[in-house]
Structures are given as C-alpha cells and as structure tokens.
C-alpha cells in the first residue's frame, strides 16, 4: 500500500521503516508471500528452506560462457531467469498454487547466486559457491567479492546495508516491472518467464536503472566545484538536464525508503572510511545543497531511494553498470 501524498509505504499493513529496522529481507519475503509475519519457528523453517536451495544447476556455469565479458548484467539476468524454466520442470505450471510457491522459493534463493555469477563472469573471476550457514545478504556479498585465494570476512554493517536494500526494493505496489510480470502471467506463461520479463522492464532507466543513471549524472558533474552549475541547469525550464535521484512520481512528500536508505548510506560510508572517492564526495555535497535549497524544498524534490542506493552500492564495491 502506498500513500504518495503522506509518504507512506506499507507491506501487508506493516510500515516499511519497521520492517527495515527490526526485521530482515527473508522476513519481508515471508510476509509478502503469506500475508502475515512468521513466528520464530516459521521464520527458522523458511530461512532454512531458502538457504538450502541457493545452488543452481552446474550447467549454468557453461551457460555464462555464451556471453561476452562486457555484456550488461541485466541482459545476462534476463537470459538466466528465462533459462530457469529449462532446468526446473516441476515448477512451471502457473495455474498450480503449489508449483507457483516452489517457483517463488527457487527464485528468491537462486537469483542472488545467478546475479553474483554474472558479476564474477564480467570481471573474469571464478564463480563462488553459496554457503548455507550465512545470512541471505552476507551470502550474496561473499559470492560477489570472495576469491579462492583468501578467506572472505563478513562485515556486519555492509551485510545489514545489503539486506536493507533488498527489503526496500521488495515491493512497490503496481510499478512497471510488477505490471509486466502480471501481464506476462495473464497469458499463462511460466513463473520464470514472467520474472524474466519483469527484469527486462526493470532494466529501463526510468525504473530499476535509475540508480545507475544517478551515478552517471554524478560522473557528468565531475567535481564539487561544478555542482552550482548543474543545480542552475536543473532549475532552468529550457534546459533538458534533469537532476537524477531527486523527487518521485508517486511520493509528493519524502520517499519513506529514502529516509532509511540515507541512514544506511551514511553508516556504510562511515564504516568504510571512504575519503578519496570523488564521486561519493560529489554525492554528499549535492545532497547537502539540495536539502537546503529553497527551490528543491518548495517543489519537494528530496533525494529518493535511487540516489542513496546507488551511492551505497558503489561504496559496497559494485560497479555502476
């Protein structure tokens, strides 16, 4: 549920800030799937079910070799998700509620593995197998950044930040990618094909690609000295330049996800003690100026979730593309 005028986002009746601060991503998954929060035993069982299905078919490793190393990861993910229907024939009947739930569990558990494999392939590193004893977010970070020659140490602050990014993006009512999934599903297409269609929609710069577009804008600004120039351009109605990462089509007030992500972003930057990244310096200064500028305050152009998530993901080590 979304109330854009009041800046409210609820998952099954629960405020997003409560879920992000007190729970974890798999708890939000359970809530969205079953309509209510789990008991401790239900949570333990659900976590175990997800984490015991994180492996993907070994033939997937060969599947990746059909792509160029510089392929956009979203192109790879669309292909991989569609290909899941070729490996898991027992969960492709979209009319069967039991098969739909099995497909949901497989998608939640295996998509991080495939995403990490896509990243590793793009940089020429060995795939890292999942570990069932780690949390969902910690496991994903390890699969992305661990290397065979040394032990990967989980940083709890970074793992928590990744988990919150997952929670904040778990649901947003009838957005473009959700609409695409439902449209594909209305034809009777299998769940994996439907999700692949949704990911293809998410690729668009006006949707999931917004945080990438925000980082590219920061690269275009180039230095802190040029921020006033770009602020002036953003105010000029005759200039096609748009300040990415500010304002929201749905939220006429502050994006409730942005409040949470702002705190998380600053925690990550503090934890990593990042002081020599010009892009992050520009982002922090741009945030300060925009939050104190009367033009942005009057028009309620506050930094949105894409602004902070893009900066956070970059700080975590994910390349812009």
UniProtKB/Swiss-Prot annotation:
Pfam families: Citrate_synt (PF00285). One of its GO terms (molecular function) is citrate (Si)-synthase activity. Belongs to the citrate synthase family. It catalyses: oxaloacetate + acetyl-CoA + H2O = citrate + CoA + H(+). The active site is at 248, 306. Gene3D superfamilies: Citrate Synthase, domain 1, Cytochrome P450-Terp, domain 2. The lineage of its organism: Bacteria, Pseudomonadati, Pseudomonadota, Alphaproteobacteria, Hyphomicrobiales. One of its GO terms (cellular component) is cytoplasm. The gene is gltA. This is Citrate synthase. Pathway: Carbohydrate metabolism; tricarboxylic acid cycle; isocitrate from oxaloacetate: step 1/2. Citrate synthase is found in nearly all cells capable of oxidative metabolism. GO terms for biological process: tricarboxylic acid cycle. Keywords: Transferase, Tricarboxylic acid cycle. Its EC number is 2.3.3.16. It comes from Bartonella elizabethae (Rochalimaea elizabethae). Coiled coil: none annotated.
């Amino acid at each position: 549920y979304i109330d854009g005028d009041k800046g409210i986002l609820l998952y099954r009746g629960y405020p997003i800030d409560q879920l992000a601060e007190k729970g974890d991503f798999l708890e939000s998954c359970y809530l969205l799937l079953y309509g209510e929060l789990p008991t401790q035993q239900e949570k333990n069982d659900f976590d175990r079910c997800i984490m015991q299905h994180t492996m993907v078919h070994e033939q997937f490793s060969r599947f990746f070799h059909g792509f160029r190393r510089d392929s956009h990861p979203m192109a790879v993910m669309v292909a991989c998700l569609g290909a899941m229907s070729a490996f898991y024939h027992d969960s492709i009947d979209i009319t069967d509620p039991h098969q739909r739930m099995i497909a949901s569990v497989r998608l939640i558990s295996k998509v991080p593995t495939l995403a990490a494999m896509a990243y590793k392939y793009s940089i020429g590193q060995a795939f890292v197998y999942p570990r069932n004893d780690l949390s969902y977010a910690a496991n994903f970070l390890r699969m992305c950044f661990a290397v065979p020659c040394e032990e990967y140490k989980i940083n709890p602050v970074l793992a928590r930040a990744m988990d919150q990014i997952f929670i904040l993006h778990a649901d947003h009512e009838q957005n473009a990618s959700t609409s695409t999934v439902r449209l594909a599903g209305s034809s009777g297409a299998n769940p994996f094909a439907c999700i692949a269609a949704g990911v293809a929609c998410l690729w668009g710069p006006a949707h999931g690609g917004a945080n990438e577009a925000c980082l590219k804008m920061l690269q275009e600004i180039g230095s802190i000295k040029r921020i006033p120039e770009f602020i002036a351009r953003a105010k000029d109605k005759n200039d096609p330049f748009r300040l990415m990462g500010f304002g929201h089509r749905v939220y006429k007030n502050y994006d409730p996800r942005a409040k949470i992500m702002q705190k998380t972003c600053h925690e990550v930057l503090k934890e990593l003690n990042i002081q020599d990244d010009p892009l992050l310096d520009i982002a922090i200064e741009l945030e300060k100026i925009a939050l104190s500028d009367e033009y942005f305050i009057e028009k309620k152009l506050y930094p949105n979730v894409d602004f902070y998530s893009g900066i956070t993901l970059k700080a975590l080590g994910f390349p812009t593309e």
